[in-house]
Each structure stands twice: as structure tokens, then as C-alpha cells.
Amino acid sequence: MNYIINLKMDYKDKALNDLRNVYADFDSLPLDFRQILIKDRATLLQKEDVEKKILERQEDAKKYAEYLKQSEIPERISLPNIKRHKGVSISFEETSEDMVLEPRPFIFDGLNIRCFRRETIFSLKNKILNMVKESSSFKNVSRQSVSFMYFKIFNKGKVIASTKSVNIYEDKIDERLEDLCNNFDDVLKKIIDVTYGYESLFVSETYSYVIFYAKSIYFPQPRCVNNWGNNIPNILTFDSFKLFTANKNNVSCIKQCSRFLWQKDFNTLEEMIEYKNGNICIVTPQLHINDVRDIKSFNDIRLYSESPIKTFSVIDNTITYLFYFKEHLGVIFNITKSRHDRRVTKFSPLSKFSDVKNITVCFDIESYFDPEKESNQVNIPFICCASIIYNKVIGNIVDFEGRDCVAQMIEYVVDICGELNISSVELIAHNGGGYDFHYILSSMYNPAAIKNILIRNNSFISFNFAHDGVKFSVKDSYSFLLCSLANASKAFLNEETFKKTDFPHHDLKTADDLYKVYKEWSSVNTEINHVVEKEKLLITSEHIVNFTKNDKSKTLIEWSKDYCRNDVLVLSKVWLEFKNAVEDIFNCELVDQTMTLAGLSYKLFQANMPFDVELRHPNKEDYFNMREALIGGRCISVNGIYKDVLCLDVKSLYPASMAFYDQPYGSFKRVSSRPKDELGIYYVRVTPNRNNKSNFFPIRSHNKITYNNFEESTYIAWYTNVDIDIGLSEGHNIEYIPFDSYGNIGYSWSKKGKIFEKYIKDVLYKLKIKYEKQNNKVKRNVIKIIMNSLWGKFAQKWVNFEYFIKSEDDIDFESEEAYKIWDTDFMLIKKIKESTYSSKPIQNGVFTLSWARYHMKSIWDAGAKEGAECIYSDTDSIFVHKEHFKKNAKFMLNGLKVPIIGSEVGQLELECEFDKLLCAGKKQYMGFYTYFQDGKPCIKEKKRFKGIPSNYIIPELYAHLLSGADKEAKIQFLKFRREWGSVKGYIENKTVKAT
């Protein structure tokens, strides 16, 4: 880098005279050579002049000191009879090298220095004030505390320059910070003007960095271990380490610690540091810790500013760890990894990993928003917690604070990858596709770097992006676990205390709410209120926080860190349990090769397919014709209030429908008539028979599917031969009609067979039984969800869209479908992707659902008594009066006559017997049943009301809706709406009625 030296003219003139005296022919030398000689000589003269002035000032200072001593001015020179106050400092420092604190350092024009932005320095205001308040809080002091701050510029570990210190006053903190920043700007300008001595700031190949240093000094009276508290034991045991307290009052703490560590008798800390060659790390409690016994974990301690080792991020057993608190020294020893079996886990340092090959980051975001104010409904992130998994070991949990917390996390992970030479990272969030992943978009400097975007129902399935040489693969754990994190922790974790906790999210509406002080709580409950207003039932809620009896209090932002850390630790544990179980069961890292559980199950099926079976993928026209025959599970409701009702569920209905019934395979053909003994999908005209009481044929009425409430109006539709045969048996009039100009009525497969039986029955189900016998609930649950998810991949929609992100300036709005990404200048582009063939064989998904209806009909026909009525049914369930059903009946399954009630795949399970059942429509029921706990009868409920959160489903809702045909209810509850790059939370006012 070129630079200009701005030396005063008198140095240049003197240098010129000196050179002319030395070289007689100086003026005849080449001009460039003369300028170099003048510059070098002038620089030397200036340096000599500066050194001379320093020596003169030192001499003057000595003379003035002698004068003060002779004048006996005690305020300036300590005399033997004058007591000096020994100061103790509280300090902290931050470096612009820290990409978490300063993700976007600015480069001062002309200098190779990474500087703090002013807003970053001002963000430290609360930390500075806490330091000042702590130093001024001590009562037993000799004089008033003093506080100050300054900047230093470092290059290759050396201090190059510094600002003058600025005193800190609590009531003028903003003004003082502004003065300090102005001082720093002045220093940089002077460096550019002077240049000499600062060459490294111009020409160094490496950047220089700025360190912000804040210090507060208080002046305590002499202290001992008693200042840690009374009767402090020799050893204190904490969550992840032990502390030697050096609790003997008659021996110095330095000597006690050196004896404890090395059987040495050192008298100063410097001697200890020298003995260990500087390999000592000194830590001290966080500012909020006033008693050593309040320390719980690593999260409650911080690096001491005078520590020789300047990092506490990685625990190294070759380092000695000392604990300094209230002028007393102790020793930290027996450092272990944080235990994972507690309710809330806080930050714990890494253990040094030498051979890391894979990094997974599980993260979660906490945000504030006001659902009742439209202008404040956007969820604003304020905390992002990340659990770093090294290979298959959970390491540290780190939290990032601020609106840019997600960006901070990404930068932090990149730094770790750089240290460990890792080039790819798996990034996991639970329900991230519907929430957390949106904030990755709005946190990136260039969202267009995001590639391979997969979206389903406006939720991200996955995507990837590269940042600073690290490739991030983003996945949603919900796409694999298919349940809430709370339920996943119950299914996959053995520790009873290791579970998701409650948090009063309702009180976090603005940034100011983050600093509300809350006592510790045990739970947060939602209390449901209901009232009838003008014939309409109104259901609302209020949140009740149940506080504990202890006096522990913290701000909500501090509580949220505990909550968020616990969540990511639970997610990390669940994700590892799931991945490890899949790998252990199938001897393959399948999760890394797939994006969803259905995709994983599909890959497993492919690996276990019969060699002579091919499943042909239809072209676009045939696909959409066949998909018209894809009809979801049977759902009926006979509204009313009932007593003594059996609640029956088929065990693994869809796996049974795939394993025990013929499926089409091989090539298919268009046919003009229905071939005998072949499976087919046909275009038909249907005239329903209203006298039918069986209700297993899906009738299309007013663009909906119904089974027991329809008109005798003729319609045209696609059905499988399985559904057609059910319809004919129920007396419906069904006629085959052509769908193309060649007179073809549908599609037929000449090959059929139980192609899923081996995979489901001989592989998955046998594994499930094996793990049940071993009482291995983790592997049992893995097999269960894999088995139940397979059919979904065969019913996959036509994938005809691709997504990518572009800058607003690059979009052709006339031809491109674009969606704004919140808080950025980028947009998500949705583009049609032309494909010739479907990605999956849709016909097998269609037949799975048809056989499921056939299976349910077979069970009903075998178990229902004459005149029995199915009160309610939804896909795999049957609610029927107890006296109307034969529990001991048998039906034909896979060529065998088996009991309808049993524990095998395809049989009914008696879940409970309702004492009372309220039905108000499809997917709108509530049943009460009795069970015994410790010999005492208890009442439990099973309920469902589609579109309504579970805790708002109350008996009064059903009673009101069933009291009259025109009765309505309005339910007010919190709901979220995704807007690319952000999420909005708002109050939904949903009106419902009996259907």
C-alpha cells in the first residue's frame, strides 16, 4: 500500500542541509534518489528530536518530584505516615476482531484497521453501567470509585496506538461514549498525518484491530475468604466443576492455591504465572453474582481482564484455571462437560476436539411482537440460541442477542468451521420451515446466495447457502419427527426432567418488555373464558403465570435465554437420538441423504423392493387423471350427545392397506373396458343411492367428499376399481364413460401383488416388535413413524415449481411471480418447472387410500350388529354404541380370519370407552372416559376441533353448537402468518358452527 509521509518543513530543510554537507554532489543526484534520502534523514531527525524531548520531560518530572517531596505534599507523594488506598478493578474488554459482537467492522479510509461502528460501542452501554454500578455498590471502601474507558489499536499482538481515557459518569454515559468515539477519530487522523512509527497500520498484510477497554476501580478495605460468605467449605461443587476455596484465614490464598496445585509456596500471583509459563486462565463471576454460592454453571463466570490466557471458550487440561472474586483466589478443577439431564442448560465451554469431521447446529429464535396491534405484529428476533454438535457430541450452547442474532450465529459458526477446517454444516430448527428459516432470509447480506429451495404449503422444507467458504444445509426437524418438540422429547428422551419448559411469551410485546423483572415460575397456563353474547358463544383466554416460592428474579431477556437454551438442548438431544437410531437400525446415514421422513421411508422401501417389481411414473396428463381418484380418509359424524360409546382405532391402517392388499406395478395401459381381475382407475358417472346406510363409498357433492349426507344428483369423477366395487355394493349407480377421443375409460395394470408386504411386515414390523421386547422406546418410535409415513411419498403432488431469490432490481415483474422478502431488497421468485413425468408413482398412493376404506368396511361389516350406526369415524377410527358392536367378531385379513380387536397391524385397538360423547361435525368431537390411577377413578377427555387450538376446546363449545341448528361460536386465539423473511402473530377471530 502506498502512503505519504507528512513531515514538518524544518525537518526536511535540516535533512537537506545535512545531506549537502555529506555529499558534495548531492544536487546532481537523480530526483527520486534525492527524495528518498531526504525522507529517510528527516524521519531519523524527527525520531531523535522526539526521544530528546522525552528525556527532557523525564528529567523535569524527577526534579518536580523532589520538590514535592521536600514540600511534603502527601496528596502527590506517599510518605511513610500516609496510608495509600489499594484499588481493585472491575473491567472488561471487547475486540473488533469478535465477529459476534462486531459482524460488520468499518475500515477507516487510508488505514488497514478493522474499527468498531459507533452503534456497536453504544450497544455496550448497559454493560458499562453495570460495571460502574457494581464498583460503586461496595460499602466497605476507603474512597470513592473511579471509572474510565479508552481504545487501543493492536497489530500482531502489539499495541500500536491508544486514545486518552475518558471518565465514565452514569448520568452522562451517552455524552462520554460520544467523546470517546470522537477521540478515536482524532487519533486515526493524527496517525495519517504523522505516519512515522505507524507504518504497520498502512502496509501490514494483516488487519489491525481495535480493543475497547472499560475499567472501574474501587478501593476496598483488606479482605479474606470470609467475604465469600460465612463457613465456606474447602471445596464447593458446582454443575460442571469444583472450586477449591482456600478457606484458611491464617494462610494467604496465593500460598494455599499453589500448595493445592503443585505443593509449592508461592507468595504472588506473578510467581504462579511464571511457574506455568503463562499457561493460566483466571476467571471471575458475572457481574450479577454477589455470592460465590450463587454460581450454578459456566454461564455464571467470565474471563478476568488480567488473565494471561485470553479465552475461556475451549477447555484445555494443560491450562490451570484460577477463580478470582472479591480479592480472594481459588482454584477451579475437575472440569467436566455440562450434564444434559437438567431442566435448563446454560453455556458450557467446548472440550478440545482434534478430529471433527461433521458439525450440526440446532438453533431456535425467540422474538417479541404485539398480536393486538397491527403495526407491531411482525415477530422481531431478539435472541438466537445455538447448540453446536461436533461429530455426534453436543458441545457448547451459545446465545446471540439483538435484531441481527441470526446473522451473528452464522458468523460464529463460520469462525468455528475455519478453526476446525470444516467446509459444510447441517443447520436444524424445529418447525424452522414455518418460522426460524424465514429469518435466515432476512438476516443475510445477500439472500440470493440461497439455493435449492424446497417449499411445501408456504413452508420451507430445506435449502442451502454458502457463506465465507462454508456450505450450510438447512433442514426442518419437524419434517422428520412429525410432532411438537414437547412430544418429541417424550418420545425420544429418557430423562424425565429433560423436557421443554414454559415461557410467558404473552408479556413480550415490545423491546422494552425484555427488561421487565420476573420472579421464577413453575408453569404458564392458559385459562379459557367463555360467555354467550347475542346467541353467540365467545371463547377467549388469559395467561396465568404460576410463580415459585423462592425470591429468584431476573429480567425476561435473561429468563428467555434459559428457556431458549433449554429448547435447543432438547432439540439437539432429540435430533441425535433420532439420527443415531436410524443409522444404527439400518446401518446407513439415511437422514443426511433425505429432507423429510417420507423421503427417508421411500428410500428404505427402494432398498427393499422385490427385484422383479417396477413402479412406472405416469406422464403429466395421466398423473392428474389418476390423482383425481386420490381421496383422503373417510370422515363422518352423526351429530349429537351420546353415552356408552366405544372408541376404536385401527393399528397402523395405512401400512396395513399397503402390506395386505394388492398394489399395481409394471406398465399401465389405457383401456376402453374394465379388464377382469386387474387393478384400474376409471372415469365414471355416478348417481348416488340415498337409501344406502353403509357409507363407505366417497360421494362427491358440492366439490366436497361426503359419505352420509348427499343429494341424488349425478356427477362425473375418477375412482379406483376398489372404490367402484364398494359403491356398487352399496347400491349406487356407476357407469364407465370415455375420457379421451379414443373411447378409453381409464387405466389398468396387468400386474398386481403385495409388493409392500416384505418391507412392512418382514422388515419394519419385525423390527418394531424386536424393540418393544427390548423396551427400546427410541428405536420403536423411529420404526413406527417410518412405517406410517411411507404412503405419503406415493401421494406426492406434481412438483412443477422451482424457487430462487433475486434482487428487486433484476426482476421482470411482467413475467416473474415475485414475493417480497421482509426487510430486504430481495424477492422470492416462483417459476414453473416443466416435467414430462411425475417424480413418484401416484397410482400406489391412490390405491393405498382406497384399500384403507375397504379395510374399514370389512371391519365394520364383521363387527357391527344389525341396525348399528357409526356415530363418528375419521380415517382409522370408529365410534359406536357399546351394545351395537361385536368385540369378539373376526374378519378376513391377508387370507386369514383374524379377530377384529387385537394388537397386530390392521386390527382394531380399544382405545377407551366414552361415558359421554359430544359430536358437532367432522373433526369436531369431545369424549369423556374413566380410568383408574392408584385405585381411584379419574376422568380424561379425548377431543378434536379442526382449526382450533386444543386448550380452547371446551365442553361448553359443543353444548352450545348442539343446542340449535343456527348456533355459532367465536373463538379468539393467537395465530401466525408467514410472510417471506418474517412471521406475523395476530389474534384470529374464528367463527364455527356444527357441520
From Swiss-Prot:
Pfam families: DNA_pol_B_2. Keywords: DNA replication, DNA-binding, DNA-directed DNA polymerase, Nucleotidyltransferase, Plasmid, Transferase. SUPFAM superfamilies: DNA/RNA polymerases, Ribonuclease H-like. SMART domains: POLBc (SM00486). PROSITE patterns: DNA_POLYMERASE_B. InterPro entries: DNA-dir_DNA_pol_B, DNA-dir_DNA_pol_B_CS, DNA-dir_DNA_pol_B_mt/vir, DNA/RNA_pol_sf, DNA_pol_palm_dom_sf, RNaseH-like_sf. It catalyses: DNA(n) + a 2'-deoxyribonucleoside 5'-triphosphate = DNA(n+1) + diphosphate. It comes from the Eukaryota. One of its GO terms (molecular function) is DNA-directed DNA polymerase activity. One of its GO terms (biological process) is DNA replication. Its EC number is 2.7.7.7. Belongs to the DNA polymerase type-B family. This DNA polymerase requires a protein as a primer. This is DNA polymerase. The lineage of its organism: Eukaryota, Fungi, Dikarya, Ascomycota, Saccharomycotina.
